[in-house]
């Protein structure tokens, strides 16, 4: 895992300021190796990257969230929410069959009670799927007073069923959350002009890579 960091670092000849464990495999299903890698990235005799610049993101493996909290790790934790209800999230993320929305939010509360640290909830906005005003209202009820940050992520389009929400819809969604009890931010991805944004990296034509 750390080799990936070093490979990129040596390729771009620039300082890498942040590391996020997510995608290309669920981090909490490779729990110990991910934690070991984060420790090496953070260690003063390793990469010496500040702990506050390292984030581990999970789709919501509840037993591992609890373990992570109890072990007292100092790296940020993020959960991919992506739905405003159990039925909706189940259609987007099959993991909801095993770990329900209510159980996931409770695990986020448990994480806060144990660690006293804010958690980030990630919410990818999908046109016509989870970007309605009613979704914003449900999120405010679902999340309630949980000490957290809701990170809204406009979808980066690739060939497939989902599409990016319009700028107008994104703005309306954000405005609806203006009076929520939690912080709301928007993550604008870079590299989308070359299909290199978050979630876009893929081999489009295998013939070109033989």
Residue spans for each PLM region:
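Alpha/beta-hydrolase active-site loop
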Residues: 1-5
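Conserved AdoMet/S-adenosylmethionine-binding subsite of the radical SAM
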Residues: 7-185
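Radical SAM enzyme core and accessory elements
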Residues: 179, 189-210
